[in-house]
Curated annotation (Swiss-Prot):
Family named by the database record: Belongs to the thiolase-like superfamily. Chalcone/stilbene synthases family.
Protein source organism: Arachis hypogaea (Peanut)
Catalytic activity as recorded in UniProt: 4-coumaroyl-CoA + 3 malonyl-CoA + 3 H(+) = trans-resveratrol + 4 CO2 + 4 CoA
Entries under InterPro entries matching the protein: Chalcone/stilbene_synt_C (IPR012328), Chalcone/stilbene_synt_N (IPR001099), Chalcone/stilbene_synthase_AS (IPR018088), Polyketide_synthase_type-III (IPR011141), Thiolase-like (IPR016039)
Compartments in which it is found: Cytoplasm
A GO molecular function held by the record: trihydroxystilbene synthase activity
Record text on subunit structure and interactions: Homodimer.
KW Acetylation (keyword) present: no
Annotated Gene Ontology cellular component terms: cytoplasm
Active-site feature positions: C164
Primary location group: cytoplasm
A Gene Ontology BP annotation from the UniProt entry: polyketide biosynthetic process
Pathway: Phytoalexin biosynthesis; 3,4',5-trihydroxystilbene biosynthesis; 3,4',5-trihydroxystilbene from trans-4-coumarate: step 2/2
Protein name stated in the entry: Stilbene synthase 1
Amino acid sequence: MVSVSGIRKVQRAEGPATVLAIGTANPPNCVDQSTYADYYFRVTNGEHMTDLKKKFQRICERTQIKNRHMYLTEEILKENPNMCAYKAPSLDAREDMMIREVPRVGKEAATKAIKEWGQPMSKITHLIFCTTSGVALPGVDYELIVLLGLDPSVKRYMMYHQGCFAGGTVLRLAKDLAENNKDARVLIVCSENTAVTFRGPNETDMDSLVGQALFADGAAAIIIGSDPVPEVENPIFEIVSTDQQLVPNSHGAIGGLLREVGLTFYLNKSVPDIISQNINGALSKAFDPLGISDYNSIFWIAHLGGRAILDQVEQKVNLKPEKMKATRDVLSNYGNMSSACVFFIMDLMRKKSLETGLKTTGEGLDWGVLFGFGPGLTIETVVLRSMAI
């Protein structure tokens, strides 16, 4: 008689979950951060708020962002004037945009990842779709299956309103799926759209104004699987371990509420301090079992929540400036795309490692960390092992 343990062994993969392909995409509309304050106050009919506009210009400059991609154009905003007000009923219009655009850009990223992977779509067994933008029944995961033509037997996991830490969350779930289901191939798609949060300025709401200077649109797709087929699948990173922690005494630091006016959010000024004060604990928990205590000896893929967060993490951990180069490059060229950010960084890192002749996908190093920070305050920590190039 076959034992339960024997059945369980057959059902599971032998090796660790591995990143097999990465694809990214953005809406075609690209905005110049240096002129965004002028544009933003003009399209929202706020040019009379001269002092607030000057303050917003300084906020834009401090972000160290050069460009961002956004679905919303001036033409779209003219057709939807309530979205330009500070708080006017506009959820219907926002939802109509997002349930269309979120899966569309997600499809573009997924198509690139599938092309790099080089295997038939019929081999995809699971789909994880993550977005903070738009809610529908059936979800945008269903819409993506239709757009791509995936097999209807694909097992779907739809994750809404996770926020900026979710790049780590989807890897944690994908790791469990890939390692506990033999031959599983998990397609992850994170697609974010600022149509859910765009609104006009108000001098009493600086949190919203900071968000208008920071957030952007983008999608990333990753294919995860264990036991890559030799000479057929090309491993990029192995997912060694994952962890999620709610930071004590951080309630109210980051959050949001979906209302008739769209998604409203709050960003406490203490967020950079909270993250930096807890970063060493997260690193120690992840890397002590590996005997690693020098965090300059690993590569870094950190969610680019903002310049202040990156600066304080660098200072707290005594990181060399170059450790955050990939993260800061993505921040500069794309802005904060919430859950998708870490995969843009991962993609850039492996490409730059190849271009510069380094020996591994992780800037020539063997071990690395992927961090996500977001509502809760929540910290996701993922330990990665790079692959030889």
